[in-house]
Amino acid sequence: MLPQFRQWVLVNNSGQTLTFNNNGRINIKETAWIIDPTTGKITYTQLADDDLGFVAAGSLANGSEIVGDNEVDNTANLYLGSQVQIEITHDEGTAADGTFDLYMAEGDASGELQTDASGYASASANGLKRKATLVWESNGLDDEVMRSPVREVE
């Protein structure tokens, strides 16, 4: 079952800075699922795409991370799991060679996430669980769009 509260954290290990004003984009696509108590069938709900707050004038240096600006409340829907995919448009795609790693900060009924804590340092330092990885394999184009494989998250 997905945690009661959660938030995405994306780490850029692509070897290059991602810059919004040069056409760099981040998009996390997610479809959540639950077993319908009436029919017993799996019901899917496409959640809003999440850009993690990566907006105009934003940049994400190699080796740094962005903590999403959306904290997802799962207390009403009680989703059991979801499928997630990372979609990146890399403005320095020809020079990039590495990964984008997606982590999940989790919280319980108190709503406190690891990313909320005053001692939060980074996804790896705080032991967040990696949920998906996009391996950047350039096709020789800048402003190229790549998508990770779809991963099941529970």
Task: Place the predicted regions along the sequence by residue.
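Surface-exposed, low-hydrophobicity beta-strand/loop segments enriched in small/polar/acidic residues
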Residues: 1-154
